[in-house]
Swiss-Prot record:
Residues 1021-1030 have a biased composition (Basic and acidic residues). Belongs to the AEBP2/jing C2H2-type zinc-finger family. Residues 1053-1090, 1099-1110 have a biased composition (Acidic residues). It comes from the Eukaryota. Residues 1-28, 60-117, 359-388, 441-468, 856-877, 917-947, 991-1213, 1352-1371, 1511-1605 are annotated as: Disordered. Residues 1035-1049, 1112-1126 have a biased composition (Pro residues). Keywords: Chromatin regulator, Metal-binding, Nucleus, Repeat, Repressor, Transcription, Transcription regulation, Zinc, Zinc-finger. A zinc finger (C2H2-type) spans 1260-1285, 1293-1320, 1326-1350. This is Zinc finger protein jing homolog. The keyword Translocase does not apply.
Length: 1605
């Protein structure tokens, strides 16, 4: 549907162009300039006397606005071509709403591409409110769209523009742009929406002013239909339909999408103008609706008409401020939220001030023309402050969505929630102007006041919601949005600006905003769902003044769960869903601490992370189905908007009551899923799961209550007094809600969906006065659909799992929750964590969720640390994340893939975060608790049992505990748990806290991982390396051994001893914290393998067996400083730090290191073999050889120089020398110098070096007959030709140049010959006559000029410096530049990689090689063994087998010629034989030594028969040869036997084989006997230079070797 541009309504007149889709009222101020809105200026709502600055949301409006954002008087093509665009507009208005809006606007904008002339819009809006793109009244864009519809509409352009801007809106950028005004980073309009809602609800009077318009926009943004309205300004019905379709994303709502958008906006306006609803003024108010369209969704058309009727909205600018205040008051009365109204008024005032001072100074007076230009000034507008109140906007949007249609709410909830998560931190900034109270509620800072306000607001909102749900869900949305604007409590808004704030909250302001945004996603998906959701939202957000507190904790926990269960109010946050799950997990942990989260998990269990994401679609789908009903209801809803809003406010109480009364019913709603189309679908299969999850949560709650004390310390963070008022408000609201719910069956359904346990948890949380806003509700509600998925954390504790789920599902969701409560929970968490390792770990899991959601919640239910699935991790995570709630949680989400958490809770911090990050998609919560202390963790813990005390110490540190979830991805990899750091006690304490701290920095996942990494602050780099190696070769079996063997590992080569000692003190305790739920793990290292495996299983994404195993070995390594360097592979694997998991790269590096020579002098052969074994067995973690190899590897890294020094070649091959050689680049590259150093011929011939002529001849070479002279330069060649070949001729003159065309053709002209030879010798025959100048020129004239320059004073100095011969080729000279390309071969000579060091090394190696080849250039001595004898015609023959075997063939030798040894030059061996010889030298030396030694014994026996003279001679020759080649026989000696490891003959071969350890050559005297033994044995390289004595030496060597042996 294309929206025709809406004419600006004068305050007095109704006439004007209206959007085709809906007759939304538009005051002149309401008129939105598309161009100006497109501009990145905060939209302004200006009355004649009132200028309302809207939060600057350059990204939000873009959905509706065309790409042109720059000109006040510019034709902006606003096209809502795709539902995503429309949603973006809504998201701009509200953080949470965008998700829903995107579908709605998208539907509208696709059909409608509106170009709005900003100037025209401003002119039209002169009478009423005019919104300019500069002012950034993106919310008011509907008017712009209406006007734009007048102009050419281009769907493609609009879509692009919307998409581009929309992206901005989705981001947190907008929050940053407007300080005071932008409450939500992405939904600047949310603040305005709140105001707009009031105005809309009260009458069109306030709508007249820009502020009113902005308020309407804010409401619309909450509804996240603002852009949709812009798109649908022309056609009310169409817009409504599109909104429904967008939210629902179902074919059913295709017709209703535009109506839905309009209806949503109208609903908001209706709520505001419920009292002054008049059909007569519907047309005039269509434009106002454009301003406030964002607020209205399903019933936007009728409501907008009513708004248009409203005189105040239409009133001229002069009356805008007064009317705006009046409207606010009216809205307050309607919604029964006086405090909210006051806040709205304040926001208006704030907006007015910012409007003038902001980006562009546009006069506050509402002028049609100015409207275009004004949008710039409201970059930071008070209305944006509504954005900070994520919960309020969210609630409002929720209500509006419910009233308008479940479909609209579905998409809005999804996107708005994501945006809200993104923008939640910014909501804090926006709080400064108007939205501070709401934001505080969200943040629990102004929890009490906001709770009270929420109560006031929520009741009217719930009432309105009921009426709206009955009449029109759209109106309900409008009312909610308006109430949100006016009242801090975040009532069920449409997930508009509030929801968009989610992301900001996740970052910084997350604690409060995040909490509410979590609730925000719980928007009704269908009319019935909307009704149910609206009460739930109202109760969750509006029920308590501190909507963020109780709503987030209780309402969010319970209501959100019910929404998820119902599928109507499922908290489908676009990006917030995951965050909500994380928050839910945290909240669940907190509630588990309070003992209230059992019911919440029940709700959340039915919904998986997939269910949540799918549920969003399903919710949208349902919304589409319900959109028609919502539209039908929307007409009647105007009067009931206030009631619906009130119902929402009261809904928490009703929710609790109904949950208590009908837990099964609560589970039934959980089956509702969001279909990809956006509809809510009931999953019958989910019913059993819901029931099971409900029972599970109860059981978890009971189990977790034991750990509540640990969690309790975390909870005190929030003042109980603040929560208590919330509780009172909630109770009052509950009563109202019960009444209203009776009126509205949907509310009852929603309450029924909420489990009794959830309601009880909410109530108990409120009683505790811990402001469990986030923890109770969000964790379960958000996780409700996917508890099984998040089971890893829920299993530990029902409460925790929802939070964990939210964390994993929404990167910023958990952060959002943690913000408000983060500081206090840290302390509490730390104590709990410190108190008991396991309880602490459990607490960490629970607290993590609590902290992520809110620390106060944890305090509320302090008693037992929750052992629930994710409870283990929260304690650490909670403290860390509290510091940086938004960031820390988000990182956790990002990390989830790495996390092993589900099955490896051992790294509690990491695990909790990772589990949350995982979004609990891998395993149900139940499963996680067991693996919670990752089975692999316990061994690590045992080695690092010192860690538990450290954990206790870090527990206080856990201020960064919250970030611990962030750590999860890396923490699991590098360091299993922050607190239960397998690394070492240091890891446990400082590392734990450090990990927590890093975790708190959500952005710094890597930091978190590093802290947790095996080389934590305590562990040294080597330690990390070892851990990485161990990880590379994890061995599940060794896990039990690590505890027993930890001492051995550290000694091997880890500078980690320092951290290790810490771990040693309490090896058992460490496991406990890690496996908080499972005490068994801590004491028993044996469990480690089992835990390890489960851990791996649970962390399907990030966790790998090596990673799990690594954490286990890690802790032992730290504790094992004492053990000797030699450690078996099993021990090493076991000792490998669990936290430091090796990536494929690290594994490869480890293997490479293993292959590198790293053998101590004491046992070179063994080390070599062990290295080989390790490299071979490294994949097998359990193999003991690997263990030994690992120590050697660590030694290698520690003391790689420990190679036998005597052999240069070996040293050179050793790692250190290799490093040196690596230093000279040429060693690894071709080592040929490109240009000869002596001559610069190449230089003369340009870049190509020696160039060739066309005939292929080289330059510089004289091809004259009988002349082979060569010259470096062409100049020299020309001189040679002139002097030797031309001047010598007396005539006739002939050219004797080979190949010359005129070869030997006589000429009578010497001058001709002189010119001719220039073609052969060069093109520049004329040489400068000045001494020292070798310049040549092609012409005499050029030479003359040059020579004259020599005598010019100016050129004298420089002329002499020039090179004698310019080597420039023609190609270079063609450029006209005097190129001196390579006068000197600088590139080759300057960068010669054969530097002095390299040459010395080569020389040394040559010397060593010479010693090896001193005999006959190197020979191999084979030992022969007589295997048989035969008699032939020629005589007796003996069959001799030569050892080593299979290198040379065995043969029959005449008996008289049989010798025990045989020397063969290595150069005489064929390639196959040489290959076999190399293979022999590389084989296990021990085995070869034994075999060779046995053969040697046989040879000795044979040699005994030899003559004594030959024996003595061989001894002498062998000694001399061995002395000459002391380093050459080490390889053969190693092959022969271990007893001969020092044989020098082996050295050269070893040098050639880097992997083989080099052995120190023995003294020459000793070497002689050893070398003889080696030569007799077989694989030594003989260095004897005398070939004549080689035969005798072979026999004598065997005899001498026998004597030696």
């Amino acid at each position: 549907m294309q929206h025709q541009s809406l004419s600006v309504r004068n305050s007095s007149g109704i006439s004007g162009n209206r959007d085709e889709n809906f007759p939304s009222v538009r005051s002149s101020k309401v008129t939105v300039k598309t161009a100006s809105i497109s501009a990145k200026m905060a939209p302004h709502t200006q009355g004649s006397n009132l200028t309302i600055k809207q939060q600057y949301q350059p990204h939000q409006w873009p959905w509706n606005t065309s790409n042109n954002t720059n000109a006040t008087n510019s034709n902006n093509v606003q096209s809502n071509n795709n539902s995503s665009t429309a949603t973006s507009n809504s998201s701009t208005n509200s953080n949470n709403s965008p998700a829903v809006n995107t579908p709605t606007t998208q539907n509208q904008s696709q059909p409608t591409t509106q170009q709005s002339n900003t100037a025209l819009v401003a002119a039209a809006a002169a009478g009423t409110l005019s919104v300019t793109a500069v002012n950034k009244l993106k919310r008011l864009q509907p008017t712009t769209h209406s006007e734009a519809s007048t102009n050419t509409r281009s769907n493609s352009t609009n879509t692009i523009a919307s998409g581009a801007k929309r992206i901005r809106t989705t981001n947190v950028e907008k929050v940053n742009k407007s300080v005071g005004t932008n409450t939500t980073g992405l939904s600047g309009p949310p603040g305005l929406v709140a105001v707009g809602s009031s105005l809309t609800t009260s009458a069109a009077n306030a709508t007249t002013t820009k502020k009113l318009t902005q308020m309407a926009i804010v409401a619309a943004s909450n509804t996240s239909h603002h852009h949709q309205q812009i798109s649908t300004a022309g056609t009310t019905t169409t817009t409504i339909t599109k909104n429904a379709k967008n939210f629902t994303a179902s074919g059913n709502a295709d017709l209703c999408n535009a109506n839905k958008i309009t209806a949503g906006r109208a609903t908001t306006l209706k709520t505001t103008t419920a009292s002054s609803t008049t059909t007569a003024t519907a047309e005039a108010e269509a434009e106002i609706t454009t301003t406030t369209e964002l607020m209205t969704t399903t019933s936007t058309v009728l409501q907008q008409k009513s708004i248009i009727k409203t005189g105040p909205v239409k009133t001229s600018n002069a009356a805008s401020l007064e009317k705006y205040l009046n409207l606010l008051q009216q809205q307050q009365a309607t919604s029964i939220t006086p405090a909210t109204t006051l806040k709205k008024v304040e926001r208006k005032t704030a907006r007015i001030a910012p409007t003038v001072s902001l980006t562009r100074k546009v006069s506050h007076s509402p002028q049609g023309g100015l409207g275009v230009g004004q949008p710039k000034k409201p970059v930071t507008i008070a209305p944006r402050t509504s954005d900070p109140k994520l919960s309020i906007n969210y609630n409002q949007q929720m209500v509006a969505t419910t009233a308008t249609s479940a479909i609209s709410t579905g998409n809005q909830l999804i996107k708005q929630q994501d945006q809200q998560l993104v923008k939640s931190p910014q909501s804090t900034v926006l709080l400064t102007t108007i939205r501070i109270p709401q934001q505080q509620q969200q943040h629990q800072q102004s929890t009490q006041t906001q709770q009270q306000t929420s109560q006031n607001q929520s009741q009217p909102q719930q009432n309105q919601t009921q009426a709206q749900l009955q009449a029109q869900q759209q109106f309900k949305q409008v009312v909610q949005q308006q109430l949100q604007l006016s009242s801090p409590p975040r009532t069920p808004t449409k997930l508009g600006s509030a929801v968009f704030q989610f992301h900001p909250q996740t970052t910084t302001v997350m604690p409060n905003l995040v909490q509410i945004p979590n609730l925000v996603p719980t928007q009704p998906v269908s009319s019935a769902a909307a009704k149910l959701n609206a009460p739930v939202v109202a109760s969750s957000t509006t029920s308590s003044p501190t909507t963020a507190n109780l709503v987030m904790n209780n309402a969010t926990h319970g209501l959100t769960a019910t929404r998820l269960n119902n599928g109507t109010t499922q908290l489908y946050m676009n990006g917030a869903v995951i965050k909500l799950h994380q928050i839910q997990q945290q909240q669940q942990q907190a509630i588990g601490t309070a003992g209230q989260q059992a019911p919440t998990p029940q709700q959340s269990l039915p919904m998986d992370s997939a269910t949540v994401s799918m549920g969003l679609n399903g919710l949208l789908t349902k919304s589409a189905t319900l959109s028609t009903a919502a539209s039908t209801i929307s007409t009647n809803q105007p009067a009931h908007q206030a009631k619906a809003f009130t119902l929402h406010a009261q809904k928490p109480t009703q929710l609790y009551q109904q949950a208590n009364t009908s837990t099964a019913t609560a589970y039934t709603p959980q089956p509702f899923f969001m279909a990809p189309s956006g509809q809510i679908l009931l999953n019958t299969a989910a019913l059993p799961t819901m029931l099971t999850s409900a029972s599970l949560q109860q059981a978890l709650v009971q189990a977790a209550q034991a750990n509540i004390p640990a969690l309790h310390p975390l909870q005190p963070s929030q003042p109980q007094s603040t929560q208590l008022p919330n509780i009172t408000a909630i109770i009052q609201q509950q009563q109202q809600q019960q009444q209203q719910q009776q009126m509205l069956p949907n509310f009852h359904q929603l309450l029924a969906n909420i489990p009794q346990a959830v309601l009880q948890n909410l109530q108990s949380t409120t009683k505790l006065g811990q402001t469990p806003q986030f923890v109770p509700i969000p964790s379960n509600l958000f996780l409700n659909p996917q508890n099984p998925v998040y089971t890893s954390s829920p299993s530990s504790s029902s409460f925790t799992s929802p939070i964990t789920i939210s964390t994993s599902t929404l990167p910023s969701g958990s952060t959002t929750i943690s913000q408000p409560l983060s500081p206090p929970p840290l302390v509490a968490t730390v104590p709990t964590y410190t108190t008991t390792a396991k309880p602490i770990m459990n607490t960490l899991n629970n607290q993590k969720i609590i902290i992520a959601s809110a620390t106060s919640t944890t305090s509320s239910k302090p008693p037992p640390p929750i052992k629930p699935i994710s409870s283990t991790e929260p304690p650490k995570l909670v403290p860390v994340q509290l510091n940086k709630p938004s960031i820390s949680i988000t990182p956790v989400i990002s990390n989830p893939p790495k996390l092993v958490p589900p099955s490896a809770p051992v790294p509690k911090l990491v695990l909790s975060a990772s589990v949350a990050t995982k979004a609990t998609s891998t395993t149900p919560i139940k499963d996680k608790p067991k693996p919670n202390l990752p089975m692999s963790e316990p061994p690590a813990l045992a080695p690092a049992s010192c860690t538990p005390p450290l954990l206790t110490a870090p527990a206080p540190l856990p201020v960064a505990s919250v970030p611990s979830p962030v750590l999860s991805p890396r923490a699991i990899d590098n360091k299993s748990p922050p607190a239960l750091n397998p690394l070492s006690l240091d890891c446990g304490s400082s590392n734990d806290s450090g990990i927590v701290a890093n975790s708190s920095d959500t952005e710094d996942k890597s930091l978190t991982i590093d802290l947790c990494s095996p080389g934590s602050p305590d562990s040294t780099p080597q330690k990390k390396d070892e851990e990485s190696r161990q990880e590379s070769t994890p061995s599940p079996v060794p896990s039990p051994s690590p505890l027993s063997e930890p001492p051995v590992i550290p000694a091997e080569s880890e500078p980690e001893p320092e951290p290790e000692p810490e771990l040693e003190p309490e090896p058992e305790m460490e496991p406990e914290p890690e496996t908080e739920p499972e005490p068994e793990v801590e004491p028993e290292p044996e469990d480690e393998p089992h835990l390890e495996e489960p851990k791996i299983d649970e962390s399907s994404e990030a966790v790998e067996l090596p990673e799990l195993e690594d954490p286990q070995p890690s802790p032992p390594l730290p504790c094992e400083l004492p053990p000797p360097p030699t450690i078996e592979t099993d021990l090493l694997d076991t000792l490998s730090l669990p936290p430091s998991q090796k990536s494929p790269k690290s594994l490869l590096l480890e293997q490479i290191k293993l292959k590198l020579p790293d053998q101590p002098d004491d046992q070179p052969q063994e080390s070599m073999s062990s290295d080989q074994d390790y490299s071979n067995q490294s994949p097998l973690d359990e193999s003991s050889p690997t263990g030994s190899a690992e120590p050697s590897e660590s030694q290698r890294s520690t003391t790689p120089v420990d190679m036998s020094p005597p052999s240069i070649e070996t040293d050179f091959l050793n790692t250190p020398q290799m490093t040196e050689s690596a230093k000279s680049p040429i060693l690894s590259q071709p080592k040929t110098i490109r240009f000869p150093a002596q001559n610069g011929v190449h230089h003369n011939f340009g870049r190509k070096g020696f160039r060739r002529l066309s005939d292929g001849r080289l330059f510089g070479v004289c091809y004259w007959s009988n002349c082979d002279a060569q010259f470096d330069t062409s100049s020299k060649l020309l001189d040679h030709l002139q002097i030797q070949h031309v001047n010598t001729q007396t005539g006739p003159f002939a050219c004797l140049w080979d190949g010359c065309k005129v070869h030997n053709k006589e000429s009578c002209s010497r001058r001709w010959l002189e010119r001719h030879v220039l073609s052969h010798g060069g093109s520049k025959p004329h040489k400068c006559i000045v001494a020292g100048c070798g310049m040549r020129f092609g012409s005499q004239l050029a030479l003359e000029k040059h020579v004259n320059h020599h005598f010019n004073n100016t050129d004298n100095a420089s002329a002499g410096k020039r090179s004698s011969d310019p080597p420039l080729p023609k190609v270079l000279r063609k450029t006209g530049k005097k190129l001196r390309y390579r006068r000197q071969p600088w590139s080759a000579r300057r960068f010669d990689f054969f530097d002095i060091g390299v040459m010395e090394g080569l020389q040394h190696r040559l010397i060593m090689a010479g010693s090896v080849a001193s005999a006959r250039r190197g020979t191999v001595t084979f030992r022969g063994q007589a295997a048989g004898r035969r008699v032939t015609g020629f005589g007796a023959e003996v069959f001799v087998k030569w050892y080593p075997r299979e290198i040379i063939s065995d043969d029959w030798i005449p008996e008289a010629e049989v010798t025990s040894t045989r020397e063969i030059s290595i150069y005489e061996l064929n390639p196959d034989q040489r290959f076999e010889l190399e293979a022999q030298l590389k084989t296990n030396r021990k085995a070869n030594a034994e075999l060779l030694f046995c053969l040697h014994e046989l040879n000795l026996k044979l040699q005994a028969e030899a003559s004594s003279t030959s024996c003595s001679r061989s001894s002498f020759s062998s000694s001399s040869s061995s002395s000459s080649s002391s380093g050459c026989s080490s390889a053969s000696s190693s092959l022969i036997s271990t007893p001969i490891p020092f044989n020098s003959r082996t050295e050269p071969k070893k040098l050639r084989k880097p992997p083989k350890q080099s052995y120190q050559p023995s003294s020459s005297g000793t070497t002689s006997s050893l070398s003889s033994v080696l030569s007799s044995s077989a694989s030594s390289l003989l260095s004897n230079e005398n070939s004549s004595s080689s035969s005798s030496s072979s026999s004598s060597s065997s005899s001498s070797s026998s004597s030696t042996s």
